[in-house]
């Protein structure tokens, strides 16, 4: 089945219009996680060059995002994107009436029929989710919504202490989530404020669905630690610590007299990959 899904995936990509949201970086040709991080940081840094300005970054957390997609809504959006009816009907049939059961050793639960969500581990699911959220775009030009699969970040560029556009954007996003059956987890949603002004005032917290969003000094965004001073100290320390821990295993392998080729492969896969992760953002 996965082989056929790959064929459908390749065909679906050729049917997509070039006008898709440019700030969705997952599962798009010539786009990557590094591009999403660079875009977010460039947007913030460029704005901070202006007088009396600061940036609020809201890192949205969804509860089981893939499991809450409503197939009928997805098909409607695919139709708006110009996907032909035959392909839409196939996708709807693929996502509907899916039997599911749980097996533990020799015991199997009763079968449950699912009509909501895109199955995790499915070849098509990541792209289908990205297309489901294609219309999650900012309503104000002073805001940017950066998306990478189900990781969504609202970047509010604030000038002269006027946060009205940013706060309206957050409320608009909350309404969009409710309309699209996505459960916005306010407890795990975090906000980071970058304010280099000498006389920065007190920042009023953001509330979503009546619950206050926690403000943090740093946040791990797509694997990279971003701090409120926009320095790389925390991220670098974290990478070095992680690499140092894995060096212990490399030493153990060396003591076991494994071949240099195996040791080199282990180093490149488990240590060098950490140190070079998102290195373009550090340059």
What are these regions (language model features)?
Residues 158, 171, 183-217:
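Short, conserved micro-motifs composed of acidic
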Residues 1-4, 29-36, 66, 116-125, ...:
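Secondary-structure capping and boundary motifs in well-ordered enzyme cores
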Residues 148-149, 178-202, 223-283:
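Non-catalytic, peripheral interaction segments enriched in hydrophobic/basic residues
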Residues 8, 12, 40, 61, ...:
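Mobile genetic element proteins and their domesticated derivatives, centered on retroelements
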Residues 7-12, 36-47, 163-180, 244:
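Inter-domain linker/hinge segments that demarcate the starts of reverse transcriptase
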Residues 1-118, 156:
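Conserved pre-catalytic core of RNA-dependent polymerases
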